[in-house]
Amino acid sequence: MTTNKKDDKITKIDINTNIDITDFIDTKYKSYVFYVLENRALPRLTDGLKTTSRKILNATFKGSLKNGEQKKLLNLAGDTMNLSLYAHGDSSLNSGIATLCQPFSFLFHPLYSDGQVGSLRDPKAAASPRYLTVKQSKYADLWKTDYDLLRFEEDEGQIVE
């Protein structure tokens, strides 16, 4: 299934229907590529965050990590999936949380972990998520988003960013 953001219609392709490959690339694939570029791959100008990072921080500010409490990274990932309707794999979400904990990835990193979240040499070499605990860093309040700047949509009957 692909979506076309211009008219917000979902186009279903039946597997039994023959489609010309040039027509498919010119219409469906191009709309998918532009959707990924606009909504997932590039950081937004409003806050400099990609969608995954924004959803993680949104979950922490909605109450998942209030008052300096500490949580297992897997629990924060579950809260993010629940509160922000994160529909992609949990491994990419775990990697995104570990990236937000890395002091070398952000000038003011929003989350803190006292475990191994990667290094400059290998930023993806974080410890297993079940061993990592995370909490909001002292810079977390700097990352609170001005919600008037964001576009909200309805997904599964819930309003999400």
Model regions: which residues?
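Catalytic phosphate-handling regions of large nucleic-acid enzymes and associated NTPases
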Residues: 1-161
